[in-house]
Amino acid sequence: MRSIRWWALLVLFCLFLAACGGGGDKESQGDLGEQAQAACTGSELTEAPELPTGWPDMGEVTYTQQSDQGPTKVVEGYFDGDIEAAHDDFKRELQAAGFTILFDELEDHDSEVSWKGEGRSGQVALREECGSSDKIYVHVTNRPA
């Protein structure tokens, strides 16, 4: 009888753990999806994006929204092309403009290029979240170095 109670408690505990796990991830992914869709479908900014002096002007990139998060400036939009082209273009153009690449990574559906220059540092995060593999969500953060 004791072993049945112990197994029943173990099963209840496992069910409790299963019910608690995973919810936060889905919620944050939903928020990210909405944020990316807004950036991917928005109109081009009417004012200049708040990016460091000397930031490369890339014809394939359209910036559609920007915000401040404390001292960090966030600029978002989209890149016309695939993830590999976006990664390679940002890395090449940032280096050509005199920015130091601190880290970069290219995966199947996302990419990051971390940079430093002009007294600022940040990251260009690129993700296939615009609904097409040839239109890439761009999320640029930049803050005082």
Predicted segment positions?
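An acidic-aromatic pocket/loop used at catalytic or ligand-binding sites
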Residues: 2-11, 16, 21-145
